[in-house]
Design a protein with these regions (language model features):
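A detector of single, family-specific signature residues
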Residues: 1-338
Length: 338
């Protein structure tokens, strides 16, 4: 993808928008991009509007199947289109972006920014309006990292989901133990540590007495054998055994998936090894944290004009929406979770 640095929201503040738009909703003659295309992306279709010097305004509809997207790409290339803009509509923009990113300057615009620009007439199609805003330089490009970073982001985000699922299964087991009145979680600091895991397996097999299971305690837990023995006395039924067995099998599956993801993540990080190691010199940032940081913000900090822009994009900078002493409510972006 050609790097996009031409049209930034900061270059054209809201106060200057009326200079580009007439009262009837049409743009005036101040054009920044000569030949552009606006895309209105849906789940099944993409509506494309092309405008520019030497080009008659035309609107065509394509399906989102790969072959049709390739025909869209060929059509735009033949017209000499240089810039393409689209809204960030759920996951639907991604396959379109992937097909078109080679050879064009792509602008993924926030739908709220497009909506907030004044002057739109009701009969103007979405794709045409996006194209007009694009050519007048009124669109702010969202940060879309390179393909390698996007793939790394998929891995780290999926790992976080699996880790959450793993924690949920462990909590589920503890609830089942509580339901059976087995209180080992109140004695063991880590129910799923070495000692705790062996005790749970022994409970599942049902062959050992409470005293024999308590003897599985290791390290400092040996001094708590009496407490453990008392905590193991409960009302454990076959139903509890079935529920815990199902959760344990799921835990093993999740742990295997996480191991596979970690191996694939290390492969993706090989080209960013210098940045990966540098991030780990920050106190509190370890391997997973460093991988997540690279996956979310990339390694090219030129994308962000300042540290303030980066913190704002990450959802970690509070807004300052106040006028005449009154604060205006506005939906804030969700902070990135590392």
């Amino acid at each position: 993808m050609i790097p996009y640095r031409l049209c930034r929201k900061s270059d054209y503040p809201i106060s200057s928008y009326p200079n580009f738009i007439k009262e009837d909703g049409d743009m005036d003659n101040e054009i920044i991009i000569d030949k552009g295309c606006g895309l209105d992306v849906h789940k099944e279709t993409v509506v494309a509007c092309v405008m520019g010097s030497g080009i008659k305004k035309e609107i065509r509809t394509f399906s989102t199947k790969t072959n049709d997207l390739l025909r869209l790409k060929t059509w735009l290339s033949g017209l000499g289109i240089t810039h393409i803009a689209m809204e960030s509509t759920g996951p639907y923009w991604k396959p379109v972006f992937n097909v078109l990113e080679d050879g064009f300057t792509l602008i993924l615009a926030n739908a709220r920014h497009i909506k907030n620009v004044p002057g739109r007439k009701t009969d103007v199609k979405d794709s045409e309006w996006i194209c007009r805003l694009l050519r007048s330089g009124l669109l702010s490009a969202s940060f879309v990292p390179p393909q390698g970073i996007r793939e790394l982001r998929d891995l780290t985000r999926y790992r976080r989901k699996l880790t959450q699922a793993l924690s949920a299964e462990k909590n589920r087991i503890q609830k089942v133990l509580e339901d059976a009145n087995v209180k080992i979680s109140s004695v063991l600091s880590d129910t799923f540590g070495v000692s705790g895991s062996q005790m749970i397996e022994a409970i599942m097999e049902g062959k050992l007495s409470e005293s024999e299971i308590a003897d599985l305690a290791k390290g400092k837990l040996k001094s708590k054998k009496g407490e453990i023995r008392e905590a193991l006395v409960g009302y454990f039924q076959d139903h509890h055994r079935f529920m815990i067995r199902a959760s344990l099998e799921h835990i093993k599956h999740l742990e295997k998936q996480i191991e596979d993801l970690d191996r694939e993540t290390k492969k993706k990080l090989a080209q960013y090894q210098k940045e990966y190691e540098l991030l780990q010199t920050i106190p509190g940032v370890k391997e997973q944290g460093a991988a997540a940081i690279i996956a979310e913000i990339g390694v090219d900090m030129d994308i962000f004009p300042s540290e303030g822009h980066l913190s704002s994009w990450a959802g970690m900078s509070p807004g300052n929406n106040e006028s005449a002493g009154k604060k205006k409510a506005e939906r804030r972006p969700t902070a990135i979770r590392i």
